Amino acid sequence: FNAASYSDELRTRECLANPLHTLPSRAMLTDALGQWSNARRLHRWLLIQGSQPEDLAYAEALKRSAKRFGLKIIEEKTWSFDTDLRRTAQRELPLFTQTEEYVLVVVADERGDFGEYVMYNTWYPRPVAGTQGLTPVAWHRVVEQWGAAKMQHRLEDKYQVWMNSKVYVAWVALRTIGEAVTKTKSNNAEILFNFINSDKFHLAAFKGRKLNYRSWSGQLRQPIPLVQPRSLVSQPPLEGFLHPVTDLDTLGFDQPESSCNVSYASN
């Protein structure tokens, strides 16, 4: 199970043996943001990216999503400074974001070097989304529907922590194994893998939908919460974004976009 890497390459070109990805790919996260932005008619983006490899990967996913959902990136900017923004954000960021008018600022700063300071400091008073601001995630403590609040409280009572994305996808991996063993009444790895990767497998995971895995890449199909620190804003896929198989496949790379063809390998 991959519960650690958001890499799009692992779902499209660098196809590993026996992969099951419970963590969503970057493309799934940014496609959720793209759907919401399209639905809200926030069609003009200013993209600000960091200089780290993971920032560049997130920025590429944002650009792909913008093209996919008919959005325009009016300018791309790279934050490559080592300024202490705790002291200078109000002076430097308005000038840095002064450009042709935009309606949404999208940030690619996975490490958190500058993104937290972009909000409320842009040249135009516009919302911020991406790795900071309105953020697409696998899970967040503000997800409380579909029985999720009870699960959140159980974890908090037992371990004194809130469930986050990494904890959630690790839990989903364990639930996947438990569900497969229960349904197949087998502990054979090949039998379990083939069942999990079939259309017979479904998993209840507190997201309001039955979840399963994409047979070609091993990626878990799942809704993506869009959150701010204290509330759930939306949970794509949204109504109106259609797909011939399932609207969950409007998030991330669909089968024709991936060269992976997952099958069981014993070694």
Which residue ranges define each predicted feature?
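Extracytosolic ligand-binding ectodomains
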Residues: F1-N267
